[in-house]
């Protein structure tokens, strides 16, 4: 019902969000640059955070307020949604909650979001999740509408992704005064998301 994947945010001249190839065990030029920056004592924390891959989750869902649309895709960062969902499942002793996606005997999610802002940008963040007993089970035929999530995310090939990243660097360099590289604004996720770098060496101190 879901796929966890990694992305790099605000890449290229158009500041796109791109899928990180490491999601599918492929080499990523942006991750390579990220690791180099982490070893550079002159690199700023903002520069490093800007390249760090972020975790997202895409899911097949049915909006109970829009049943006519059938199965839809729900895509949000783990920091803003799935981390809480995972925690709520872990802390709940109800077997039905742990198996909430089951066709027979599962649960529906009642989600409450709050609107927050950071650096002038507004975004939604999950505030509360309730697991609600369904009035009736879904028919197995609903599964025929499910999207193949592995095909729902598009991964650029290595050379295309590298060019997109480098084109973005050229753009920021051209915009920056006195030949200095223009600094990117850090997003809320980059600022507040907990570090997930157990397998990487810490950044050297100056």
Regions found by a protein language model. Give the residues of each.
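OB-fold ssDNA-binding interfaces and closely related basic DNA-contact patches used
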Residues: 1-99, 159-163, 167-171
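Compact mixed alphabeta submodule
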Residues: 64-198
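Intrinsically disordered, low-complexity, charge-biased tails
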Residues: 199-203
């Amino acid at each position: 019902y879901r796929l966890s994947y990694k992305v790099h945010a605000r890449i290229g001249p158009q500041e796109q969000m791109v899928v990180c190839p490491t999601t599918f065990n492929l080499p990523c030029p942006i991750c390579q640059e990220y690791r180099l920056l982490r070893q550079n004592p002159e690199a700023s924390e903002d520069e490093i955070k800007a390249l760090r891959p972020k975790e997202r989750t895409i899911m097949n869902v049915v909006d109970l307020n829009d049943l006519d649309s059938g199965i839809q895709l729900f895509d949000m960062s783990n920091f803003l949604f799935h981390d809480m969902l995972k925690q709520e499942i872990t802390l709940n002793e109800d077997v039905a909650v742990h198996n909430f996606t089951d066709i027979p005997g599962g649960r529906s999610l009642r989600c409450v979001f709050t609107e927050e802002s950071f650096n002038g940008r507004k975004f939604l963040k999950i505030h509360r999740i309730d697991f609600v007993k369904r009035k009736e089970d879904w028919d197995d035929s609903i599964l025929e509408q499910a999207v193949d999530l592995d095909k729902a995310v598009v991964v650029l090939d290595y050379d295309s992704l590298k060019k997109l990243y480098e084109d973005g660097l050229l753009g920021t360099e051209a915009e920056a005064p006195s030949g200095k590289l223009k600094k990117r604004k850090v997003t809320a996720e980059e600022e507040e998301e907990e570090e997930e770098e157990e397998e990487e060496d810490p950044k050297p101190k100056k």
